[in-house]
Amino acid sequence: MPLNLPDKLPAIELLKEENIFVIDNSRASAQDIRPLKIVILNLMPLKITTETDLVRLLSNTPLQLEISFMKLKSHTSKNTPVEHMKAFYHDFDLMRDEKYDGMIITGAPVEQMPYEDVNYWDEITTIFDWARTHVTSTLYICWAAQAGLYHFYGVPKYPLKQKMFGIFRHHINVQGLPIFRGFDDEFFVPHSRHTEIHREDILKVKELALIAESDESGVYMAMARNGREFFITGHSEYSPYTLDTEYKRDLAKGLPIEMPVNYYKDDNPDNAPVVRWRGHANLLFSNWLNYYVYQETPFDINQIR
């Protein structure tokens, strides 16, 4: 897929080195087609890393995408250069009159706080509500998935005794859904979280379908509104060394952390990770773009309701 990204976004050069086809705005404007408009609300601390991880996975269909990045007015990022935020991110207030074919809302390092204590809770729930009438399909990832399920359906989260950390085996509960087209019977997903949601709470809500889960890591994906919303508790977008970085960071800080499970070759942190999730991560995002965004969105984007 040719990705239409803001000129000079750092991810452009990083992904070109991986032989991924990206174009900047100036080249895209010469192509006489309507690109799909995708907005990413990036709540992760290391924003450039997350941008690159997501854009990498959005690059595997023949569709042209126009990627925009949203930020919160009520929260200031402390780990990303101000110049980068000014150059590539826009406040929700400046974007709220736009319509988008797809939206991705990332995780955030606030999962151990009560939702209402998060300093941007009011703003982000406003965005959740806005997305229902301004976006064709939205992916909620990790904390955003928990927060969305709580906001819309009252599904609570629960603290874990030990961090869910590693690569876990999953299975599909609902066969035949386009989001899983091409998936194997079992597939692997990275998880890195201190809280969980319980399948029993999902099953109580008639508007939700629990479509994939793990015997080890629990709920993985719930779907609502016929695919206009997906709530995903894992991190299929993670690059090979993300868990390694988290593990060694916490070790260096003296924090209690177990080695990520099913991750390093021979369970030896001196060895490289064994990537078991790349294929299904690519399928997940390409299936979402094709079947739930491109196939469902109106040509006249203003008709999104």
Swiss-Prot record:
Claim: Signal is one of the keywords in the record: no
List of catalytic residues: 142 (acyl-thioester intermediate), 235 (proton acceptor), 237
Function as written in the Swiss-Prot or TrEMBL entry: Transfers an acetyl group from acetyl-CoA to L-homoserine, forming acetyl-L-homoserine.
Organism classification: Bacteria, Pseudomonadati, Bacteroidota, Bacteroidia, Bacteroidales
EC number(s) per entry: 2.3.1.31
Pathway recorded for this protein: Amino-acid biosynthesis; L-methionine biosynthesis via de novo pathway; O-acetyl-L-homoserine from L-homoserine: step 1/1
Site label Important for substrate specificity, positions: 192
GO biological process, one term: L-methionine biosynthetic process from homoserine via O-succinyl-L-homoserine and cystathionine
Location within or outside the cell: Cytoplasm
Main location: cytoplasm
Protein residues bound to substrate: 163, 192, 249
Keywords assigned: Acyltransferase, Amino-acid biosynthesis, Cytoplasm, Methionine biosynthesis, Transferase
A molecular-function term among this protein's GO annotations: homoserine O-acetyltransferase activity
Protein name: Homoserine O-acetyltransferase
Site residues (Important for acyl-CoA specificity), renumbered to this chain: 111
GO CC, one annotated term: cytoplasm
Enzyme class: transferase
Record family assignment: Belongs to the MetA family.
Catalytic activities: L-homoserine + acetyl-CoA = O-acetyl-L-homoserine + CoA
